[in-house]
Structure formats: C-alpha cells, structure tokens
UniProtKB/Swiss-Prot annotation:
NCBIfam families: rplO_bact. Pfam families: Ribosomal_L27A. Part of the 50S ribosomal subunit. Binds to the 23S rRNA. Belongs to the universal ribosomal protein uL15 family. This is Large ribosomal subunit protein uL15. Gene3D superfamilies: 3.100.10.10. The gene is rplO. Keywords: Ribonucleoprotein, Ribosomal protein, RNA-binding, rRNA-binding.
Length: 146
C-alpha cells in the first residue's frame, strides 16, 4: 500500500450537497429555498426580533430602569479561598491577584463568608460581609478596610 492508495473509511466522510445543479439532483432550480419571497432572495433574511410587521415584543414592553454610571463591581473572594495562604500572612489585593485567586481586581475586592477559614490572617480588602469579618476575627486574625 502506498500513500496515494489510502482511502477514508466508508461512510466517514459525507459528500457536500451542491445545490442549483439541475433538476435531476433534487436540489436544482430553487436550490431548496422554496418559491418567491424574502427568504428566497439573495441576502434575504429578517432581523432578530422581527415579527412580520406586528409590533415586536421589545417595543410592546415598557422601558424600565437605568444604568448607573457610578456602579462599582467588586471581585469576590470567599473565606475558603483564603486558606491557600500561610498562617499569619497579610493578604492584600495585590497578593490575591499575584497568587491567581482573583484574575481582575475590578473596582476592588470584597470578602464574603462562604466556606470556613482555618488560618489566622490579616486581610486587607475594600469591603467585607459581616459574616466574613466575624469569621476572620474569630480565628484571631484581623480585617482592614482599605
């Protein structure tokens, strides 16, 4: 057997369906697009949300709310993620980014009380939930808002 004699396994490769190549192919003339109309034309499609001229849902529903331009989004760190640091470490936002616990600092770091903390740490962050602050202090550590 030589390289030019290699053949793909039977049924492993599907033949591309060529449309508009004569009536005998079963896909000639209209090429599977049916008769006239918008979807039969080249480039003919309706935009997402178009309902055939009926007032679309996104226009029937009232406008609501606004986007606060001063909104702050905090990167979230849970207590169980802080266990990866050594006992007595001072955990800062820079250390969290460097160690890969947080990918993007965003508007700051917020520590939440999910999971349990096993180590005594000094944690510096922009915000703390009440349960997180309580858990850090209970282990003999300290929390500091920066």
């Amino acid at each position: 057997m030589k390289l030019h004699e290699l053949k793909a396994a039977e049924g492993s490769r599907r033949v591309r369906n060529r449309v508009g190549r004569g009536a005998a192919t079963g896909n000639g003339k209209t090429s599977g697009r049916g008769q006239k109309g918008q979807k039969a034309r080249s480039g003919g499609k309706v935009r997402p949300g178009f309902e055939g001229g009926q007032l679309p849902l996104f226009r029937r529903l009232p406008k609501r709310g606004f986007t606060n331009i001063n909104r702050k989004e905090y990167a979230i760190v849970n207590l169980d993620q802080l266990n990866k640091f050594e006992d007595g470490t001072e955990v800062t936002p820079a250390l969290l980014v460097e160690s890969g616990v947080v990918k993007n600092e965003k508007s700051g770091i917020k520590v939440l009380g999910n999971g349990s903390l096993d180590k005594k740490l000094t944690v510096k962050a922009h915000k703390f939930s009440a349960s997180a602050a309580e858990a850090i202090d209970a282990k003999g550590g300290a929390h500091e808002v920066i």
